[in-house]
Amino acid sequence: MATDELASKLSRRLQMEDEGGEATEQPGLNGAAAAAAEAPDETAQALGSADDELSAKLLRRADLNQGIGEPQSPSRRVFNPYTEFKEFSRKQIKDMEKMFKQYDAGKDGFIDLMELKLMMEKLGAPQTHLGLKSMIQEVDEDFDSKLSFREFLLIFRKAAAGELQEDSGLHVLARLSEIDVSTEGVKGAKNFFEAKVQAINVSSRFEEEIKAEQEERKKQAEEVKQRKAAFKELQSTFK
């Protein structure tokens, strides 16, 4: 290595003398002189690279503000649910993933408005169109109007932290799911059990109302049948 370096320096000095250059390198200063000569180029190159990167970011931001291009989606970033959602056990996250895949009818990794509508209907808590949109907007970090798995997990994080309004659709979803997201030991388990009992009571009342409507329709049909029979009997008396 030392021999090659020395040969290179001697070759450079001979070349400079042949060209009539007067800048003779002094022993011991060769490295410093070379560094000084190359430093401006490297600095300019670094500054140019930084300027290009900044310009690209500013142009992208301007495009996004004008509605051109797509913003980088947090939900599409590769993430590890077990490290990002440490408040949940592996079993809890597996249960959430199973539920998410169950209602991801399109198998595209998202739950869209219609799939969320079907989910809430199957859970026994149908929502209005505006209600469904509001549910998505509450955790829709990338504003794509659908739920990624990460955003789906955010629902249960907010539920466990008590950050959801009790009358909100997301609170109902978390409450009616079969996933226990309690993180407060016995107290959390007690609250979860009470919430499940309340959900069962709501479901029972809903079933009772349906049964009452069915009984009312049967009663009305029977009355119509009896009136028709009485009318026919009355007709027969005049024959």
From Swiss-Prot:
Organism annotation: Rattus norvegicus
Residues with N-acetylalanine modification: 2
Residue numbers binding Ca(2+) 1: 104, 108, 115
Residue sites binding Ca(2+) 2 per the record: 140, 142, 144, 146, 151
The keyword Metal-binding is assigned to this record: yes
PANTHER family xref list: EF-HAND DOMAIN-CONTAINING PROTEIN D, EF-HAND DOMAIN-CONTAINING PROTEIN D2
Name by which UniProt lists this protein: EF-hand domain-containing protein D2
InterPro entries found in the cross-reference section: AIF-1_EF_pair, EF-hand-dom_pair, EF_hand_dom, EFHD1/2
Gene name of the encoded protein: Efhd2
GO MF annotations in UniProt: calcium ion binding
Positions where N6-acetyllysine occurs in the chain: 232
